[in-house]
């Protein structure tokens, strides 16, 4: 997998766990930015395309023939997909597959692990959030990194467990 594109968290070549079968998308090289491509020998196959159209942006995500094959993508590719497709929501996950996020409109969201093992993810929150509060435990998380444009929080997750967070 090759990741490129201005603003992406990652840049370079990465390797997935297994081969993935997906349809080939035909697109005009001049009209689209290829943000993620699968590579095989000298061939590139677009997985995430970005087109600027009028006053907006259109993203095209190539879906594997078997939806579960998304889990075979490298962490870097999954994170880049989450980054671009969730940017308007204000929060996205950097981390492994099988972790979901459920957004609510009151500055609250749920992060759930569907894994069989412990994991640690990073939550990228737009703006300068000062802390996250774990609603169930009352624990306050402070950011690992805080910039004007985003704050990054490290969140440990237990297997098949969820956490509810409130932005402060």
Across the structure, where does each feature detected by a protein language model lie?
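A conserved amphipathic helix/loop scaffold
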Residues: 1-168
